[in-house]
Amino acid sequence: MTTTCVVHSYRGGTGKSTTTSNLSVLLAALGKRVATIDMDITSPGLHVIYNVSSQMMNFTLNDYIYNRCSFQDIVLDITNHLKLPRGAVYFLGSSMKPEEIVKVIREGYSDKFFRHVAEKLSQEYNVDYVIFDTHPGLNEDTLLAVMSSDVSLLLMRMDKQDVTGTYITGQIMKKFGRISYVVLNMVPPNLAESPDLPSEVSKIIDASVIGILPFYEEILSHRSRGVFCLHHPQHPYSSQLLKIAKRLIELTATESQTIDLTGAK
Ligand SMILES: Nc1ncnc2c1ncn2[C@@H]1O[C@H](COP(=O)(O)OP(=O)(O)O)[C@@H](O)[C@H]1O
Ligand SMILES: [Mg+2]
């Protein structure tokens, strides 16, 4: 059984790539096999956090979209690269070449692409979780990612613009029959201490808040140089996110569906 999850936010810079990368290694630490996909094709960044160089990425999602390589060519097993003792993490990166980014913006890709990738990862790599790291906002790519996923993890800050946008995003996801769970990120430390915060915010945005991650100076200072919780396993950020990983496992154990897909890419 494979669960597909899209990590998304209405606005940019909410911590999607940071959360995706840290969540992947925490799920692996819990014995899970995880694949993360950088679907922020117009501004990829996940490879930076994973310390995956362009030499390591012989082929990218862009090459696969245009039939220049096989599926196996774009799947990078980074379990050993990250020195993970348990589970597995696979990474599928996007091209950083300007001409490739322009091409995919101009030409787009098939609406079956997300489901095709998830199916391949499920069947050929036996992964438990497929996590799509997306571009922010309510664009076409996002809606495709949402429609192709079992659950959406929406990240938001305690900012009025994020609150309004997250509410709208959740409502749209509901219209597609998709469940969204919300993680509050970069929460000011004084607010994060309030035990009523998750229930209060859940009511306002009409979606379930499953975790709170305070703003930590150390994460900002880390400057995306590696996966934070591998460098700082004892840091409160790592333990808070571990709770979210466990919660996600609980929630998806009951709600995930078997992927039944037949489409071509
Ligand atoms: N809880 C946090 N506390 C402090 N800084 C954070 C936190 N989460 C993420 N960041 C920082 O915020 C910036 C944006 O994060 P990123 O994951 O790149 O966002 P996105 O992928 O949504 O654009 C990065 O510099 C990251 O280190
Ligand atoms: Mg990002």
Regions found by a protein language model. Name each.
Residues T2-T42:
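Walker A/P-loop phosphate-binding motif and the immediately C-terminal alpha-helix
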Residues V25, A29, V48, M147, ...:
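Short, well-ordered alpha-helices that flank and scaffold nucleotide-derived cofactor binding pockets
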Residues R33-V34, T42-F91:
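Phosphate-binding loop that captures ATP/GTP phosphates
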Residues T42, K97, Q161:
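Conserved Rossmann-like nucleotide-cofactor binding loop
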Residues Q72, H81-L82, A88-P136:
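Cytosolic-facing regulatory segments adjacent to core modules
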Residues F113-F215, L220-S221:
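Conserved catalytic-core segment of NTP-binding enzymes
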Residues I204, S208, E218, S239-K265:
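P-loop NTP-binding site
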Residues R223-S239:
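C-terminal boundary of histidine-terminating zinc-finger modules
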